[in-house]
Structure formats: structure tokens, C-alpha cells
């Protein structure tokens, strides 16, 4: 059973620095794309159900050009099942991929794991994005983890700005959009990210002029049903850290326990 419904206001992230990927739950492709540090380039679609892509004859794969990005962002990719892509700079580079490299991309989409580090000079890609039921299980390879820190901080503040618990977060009139959580704040959670942590918007607390979002270290999961079950137990314990927003100075800080 997918505990999807009752778990929508949490984000799980586990960073594997050696292999350059992050596994996550609760971050969807549209959030990833709209909160990217640099706008996404063209996407070579490895596994998908998108019906408006252009066809690349050399690889027999479809692709999305950057000026068409809004279409795929609005397409509801979480209903595709598997959604896997790699970004690229120029189609000329895609046409230069050899048989071995095309085979590596197909293998990666199928197994959700690359045979070799999935960064190709021909594509000059920043990411390899592998998801199943997008937002439920996402595994993203980052050439530069700064892209991850920025995206996570921006996604969290945008989620907070749009959260609806029927009456807006905490039943208050909606505040102006929250500023992006700076990467130095996210950096403070380096070690916890490596262990696997949950950022719980559902357990956010409003205190005098502050919003505090608790964080629990929960471990390394591939099975998100299991993660959600374990989270329901761990959220009864004191949090391992907080993301704190000062509504007066409009600034974010990290509190580690």
C-alpha cells in the first residue's frame, strides 16, 4: 500500500556522496525543474510516457527542448510509472553517442543504476534523473552537489508557501512567499543527509515569530513504504534538528541536536 496520501507533507533525502546521487521522496519533477539552480537544458527521455517529444533518429529516443520544458512540467509525470532522463546541451552531442553509451543509458533507465558515472562530456549533463512514480522514489545523480543544496532549499520554501492544510499553514493568513533556504543552512545538515533524514513540514511548529520545521535522522531506504512506516514511529521522538525561520528578520537558520 502506498502511504502516499497521509505522507504528502514530508520530504525524505539520503545523499550518497561517493556515488554522487541523492535518493528522495516527496520532491516531484515539477518542483525539481522550477527550483533548479540553473534552468534545465534539453532532456533526453530514457523512460517516460510523454507524448509531445521530438525524436532523435541516432539514439531512437525522444527528447524535450528547453523551450518546451513547461509542457512536460505540466504533464503529470508521476502517472508515468518510470520517468528517467538525462539533460544535454546540444543535439549534436546526442548524435555523437556511441553504441556502448546508448546501451549504458538504457541499462541505467531499466535498473535505476548506471554502469559508470553517468556524466558524459558529449552531453555536458548536470544530472541523471531516475524516478519511479515520480515523487515517490527519485534517484538523481548530480555532477555538482551545489545544485542539490540549492534545489532542496528552494523546494522547501516553495512547499511552505503553497502548503494548504485547508486553512493555510497554521491557519494564518498567507504570508508572502518565504525566501529560499540558503545552501549554507542546508550544508549544516551534511552528516544527517548522508545518513538519510526526513524534513517534516507536517510537524512544523509556529512559536513566537518563528516557524520551526523538525528533522529526523531515519536511515537509508529504497523502499518508501518502509520509510513512511518507520517515520510514523520516529516522529514521536524528539527531533534531531530544526530548520528555523525568523519571521521578523525573514531569515533561515539551522539548529542541530
Q: What is each of the regions a protein language model found here?
A:
Residues 1-210, 216-257:
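Structured alpha/beta or helical-core interaction and ligand-binding surfaces enriched in interleaved
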Amino acid at each position: 500500500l502506498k502511504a502516499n496520501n497521509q505522507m504528502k507533507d514530508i520530504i525524505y533525502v539520503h545523499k550518497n556522496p561517493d556515488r554522487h546521487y541523492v535518493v528522495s521522496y516527496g520532491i516531484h519533477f515539477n518542483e525539481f525543474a522550477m527550483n533548479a539552480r540553473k534552468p534545465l537544458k534539453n532532456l533526453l527521455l530514457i523512460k517516460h510516457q510523454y507524448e509531445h517529444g521530438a525524436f532523435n533518429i541516432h539514439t531512437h529516443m525522444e527528447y524535450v527542448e528547453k523551450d518546451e520544458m513547461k509542457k512536460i512540467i505540466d504533464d503529470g509525470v508521476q502517472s508515468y510509472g518510470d520517468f528517467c532522463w538525462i539533460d544535454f546541451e546540444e543535439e549534436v552531442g546526442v548524435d555523437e553517442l556511441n553504441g556502448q553509451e546508448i546501451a549504458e543509458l538504457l541499462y541505467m533507465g531499466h535498473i535505476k543504476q548506471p554502469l559508470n558515472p553517468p556524466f558524459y562530456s558529449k552531453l555536458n549533463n548536470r544530472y541523471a534523473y531516475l524516478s519511479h512514480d515520480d515523487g515517490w522514489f527519485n534517484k538523481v545523480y548530480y555532477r555538482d552537489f551545489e545544485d542539490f543544496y540549492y534545489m532542496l532549499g528552494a523546494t522547501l520554501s516553495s512547499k511552505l508557501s503553497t502548503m494548504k492544510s485547508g486553512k493555510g499553514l497554521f491557519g494564518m493568513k498567507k504570508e508572502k512567499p518565504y525566501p529560499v533556504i540558503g545552501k549554507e543552512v542546508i550544508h549544516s545538515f551534511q552528516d544527517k543527509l548522508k545518513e538519510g533524514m526526513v524534513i517534516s513540514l507536517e510537524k512544523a511548529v509556529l512559536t513566537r515569530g518563528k516557524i520551526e520545521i523538525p528533522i529526523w535522522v531515519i536511515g537509508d531506504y529504497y523502499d518508501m513504504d518502509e520509510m513512511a512506516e518507520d517515520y510514523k514511529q520516529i516522529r514521536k521522538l524528539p527531533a534531531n534538528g530544526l530548520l528555523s525561520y525568523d519571521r521578523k528578520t525573514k531569515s533561515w537558520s539551522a539548529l542541530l541536536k
